[in-house]
């Protein structure tokens, strides 16, 4: 058996910290799956916004569509 305890020594527990106390509720739902779509739609919206952000950055870097009428000297 892989989980068998060989000796009965005292197991040390981790120290409590403020960050741990704050993050504890986030871990309480570990392994549970909410029914339905949950936050999938919200994630899709943020992914789309991030894609738009990346396209804008790329266009600025390439001095393309967004900066056609603006002289850039760098």
UniProtKB/Swiss-Prot annotation:
Phosphothreonine modified-residue sites: 3, 5
SUPFAM superfamilies documented for this protein: Photosystem II 10 kDa phosphoprotein PsbH
Record GO cellular component, one term: photosystem II
One Pfam family cited in the UniProt record for this chain: PsbH
Any GO BP annotation: protein stabilization
Cellular location(s): Plastid, Chloroplast thylakoid membrane
Keywords noted in UniProt: Chloroplast, Membrane, Phosphoprotein, Photosynthesis, Photosystem II, Plastid, Thylakoid, Transmembrane, Transmembrane helix
Gene Ontology molecular function: phosphate ion binding
Transmembrane region(s): 41-61
Superkingdom as given in the UniProt entry: Eukaryota
UniProt-listed InterPro entries: PSII_PsbH, PSII_PsbH_sf
PTM remark: Phosphorylation is a light-dependent reaction catalyzed by a membrane-bound kinase; phosphorylation occurs on Thr residue(s) in the N-terminus of the protein.
Topology relative to the membrane: Single-pass membrane protein
Functional summary from the UniProt entry: One of the components of the core complex of photosystem II (PSII), required for its stability and/or assembly. PSII is a light-driven water:plastoquinone oxidoreductase that uses light energy to abstract electrons from H(2)O, generating O(2) and a proton gradient subsequently used for ATP formation. It consists of a core antenna complex that captures photons, and an electron transfer chain that converts photonic excitation into a charge separation.
Subunit structure, as described in the record: PSII is composed of 1 copy each of membrane proteins PsbA, PsbB, PsbC, PsbD, PsbE, PsbF, PsbH, PsbI, PsbJ, PsbK, PsbL, PsbM, PsbT, PsbX, PsbY, PsbZ, Psb30/Ycf12, at least 3 peripheral proteins of the oxygen-evolving complex and a large number of cofactors. It forms dimeric complexes.
Protein family (similarity comment): Belongs to the PsbH family.
PANTHER family: PHOTOSYSTEM II REACTION CENTER PROTEIN H
Name under which the protein is recorded: Photosystem II reaction center protein H
Organism: Chaetosphaeridium globosum (Charophycean green alga)
